[in-house]
Design a protein with these regions (language model features):
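Adenosine-phosphate binding glycine-rich loop
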Residues: 2-27, 223-224, 337-450
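Rossmann-like adenosine-cofactor binding region
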Residues: 268-367, 372
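Flexible, glycine/charged-enriched surface loops at secondary-structure junctions
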Residues: 22-25, 43-48, 121, 158-167, ...
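Glycine-rich phosphate/diphosphate-binding loop of Rossmann-like nucleotide-binding domains
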Residues: 199, 204-313
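Structured beta-strand/loop patches that form or line metal/cofactor-binding pockets in enzymes
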Residues: 44-73
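Glycine/serine-rich phosphate-binding loop and adjoining beta1-alpha1 elements at the start
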Residues: 98, 117-233
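General beta-strand structural signal in soluble alpha/beta enzymes
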Residues: 162-166, 190-194, 239, 262-265, ...
Length: 450
């Protein structure tokens, strides 16, 4: 609950101006509620209008994206880039291609990205972008033409010292490659750091593909060790999603001794009591681009349920939501608790509703918020930029070790900040406070014209 008068006033004004952007308002309210103890100690923030500036993007770019489909018909989509905050570094955040993309969702993601990037300790500001284009069902040539058209407008607003996009939902190595090629063509320059998630032959980083999923498990493992004197060993894990984050969270959790029993897509989920056959899922999703229901057709004992929201009714020790925002509501959270779940760490962005988070906290569930637990992807993007700047490549083991260190550091920064805020063990409060303080200090130092 917001009790600080300054923060209440800021939020009420924001609510009036952004009434049609519920995801953005939800993300802002969570942060403002968490940072109240910090703001109370810094009355100078109000005088400088710090919070008002922090919740307003520095810049939002909206543009049309015309492209020609294989039938020769002109199609038009809408493109966006939300450049939210550059106090601690160039804007950094992914590009999402999905029919659900709108300005409100990208503002929510860009706002979250500010604090996530801050927690990594790397010099990266916050941003997000994308389009309502749906790459599913499109040919490679259609995707290429769209990406080239998208970058033909976006290129003038980005660069390795200005704004460095990356992939997200609907934007993988193929799309990043097409956009990088068009940027290079338009600028006549090879700026490796202008986008991350590149192929290994032209400036990409080893371990980038695995980073978000691996990082989620490194964060969870450190939280288990330090807060519960426990580990993944012997635990049953429920994972939602079957994209990049889910696949590599499944891989690392299994390596750490857990048994992952579910994966899902937008149509439903599969339950395999023997443990998910990850090699099959990788082939299904990364090569054949099939649906998860095919898993149950080829694996004895596995069952498919045509309702992805029911994945949270499966008994487990640890839940790792890796699909999309607000996928766990109050009822799903209650089902998790009832069925023995004691740990929820988020691989997707804001996958739990505020009501679900209340259920976790009131039942003693160890809760790792997305801005802390899924920061591995952007952390390794930052490491990719570092390699590009140094004109060299690190080994998989070097990158993985740095990722592990960053994720363990994020846990400890979040935990220590939760103690300082008087909410020991509440990693949501801790992550928000730790991420906020670094950005706030930088903004104050750079003057109010910033």
């Amino acid at each position: 609950m917001l009790t600080n008068e300054y923060l209440k006033r800021v939020y009420e004004g924001l609510e009036k101006r952004n009434a049609n952007e519920p995801e953005f308002l939800q993300a802002v309210r969570e942060v403002l509620e968490s940072i109240q103890p910090v703001v109370e100690k810094h009355p100078e923030y109000e005088k400088a209008g710090l919070i008002e500036r922090m919740v307003e993007p520095e810049r939002i770019i909206t543009f049309r994206v015309p492209w020609v489909d294989d039938a020769g018909k002109v199609q038009v989509n809408r493109g966006y880039r939300v450049q939210f905050n550059s106090a601690i570094g160039p804007y950094k955040g992914g590009l999402r291609f999905h029919p659900s993309v709108n300005q409100g969702i990208l503002k929510f993601l860009g706002f979250e990205q500010i604090f996530k990037n801050s927690l990594t300790t790397l010099p990266m500001g916050g941003g997000k972008g994308g389009s309502d284009f749906d790459p599913h069902g499109k040919s490679d040539m259609e995707v290429m033409r769209f990406c080239q058209s998208f970058m033909t407008e976006l290129y003038r607003h980005i660069g390795q010292f200005v704004d460095c996009p990356a992939g997200d939902i609907g934007v993988g190595g193929r799309e990043v490659g097409y956009m990088f090629g068009q940027y290079k063509r338009l600028t006549n320059s090879f700026q490796g750091g202008m986008i991350t998630g590149k192929g290994l032959t032209f400036g990409g980083s080893l371990a980038r593909t695995e980073a978000t999923g691996y990082g989620l498990c490194y964060f969870t493992a450190e939280a288990l060790k330090c807060m519960r004197n426990d580990s993944f060993q012997g635990k049953t894990v429920v994972i939602s999603g079957s994209g990049n984050v889910a696949i590599y969270a499944c891989e690392k959790a299994t390596q750490l001794g857990a048994k992952v029993v579910t994966m899902s897509d937008s149509n439903g989920y599969v339950y395999d009591p023997n443990g998910i056959d990850l090699a099959y899922v990788k082939d299904l999703k990364e090569v054949r681009r099939g649906r998860i229901k095919e898993y149950a057709e080829t694996h004895a004992g596995a069952t498919y349920v045509a309702d992805c929201s029911k994945v949270w009714t499966v008994p487990c020790d640890i839940a790792l939501p890796c699909a999309t925002q607000n996928e766990i509501n109050k009822e799903s959270a209650e089902a998790l608790v009832k069925n023995g779940c004691t740990v929820v760490c988020e691989g997707a962005n804001m996958p739990s509703t505020p009501e679900a988070i209340e259920v976790y906290l009131s039942n003693g569930v160890l809760y790792g918020p997305a801005k802390a637990s899924n920061a591995g992807g952007v952390a390794t993007s930052g490491l990719e930029m570092s390699q590009n700047s140094e004109r060299l490549s690190w080994t998989f083991e070097e990158v993985d070790a740095k990722l592990k260190g960053i994720m363990e550091g994020i846990f400890h920064a979040s935990y220590d900040a939760s103690v300082a805020a008087g909410s020991e063990g509440n990693l949501m409060v801790g992550a928000n406070c730790a991420g906020f303080l670094k950005v706030a200090t930088a903004m104050m130092a750079q003057g109010i014209t910033y």
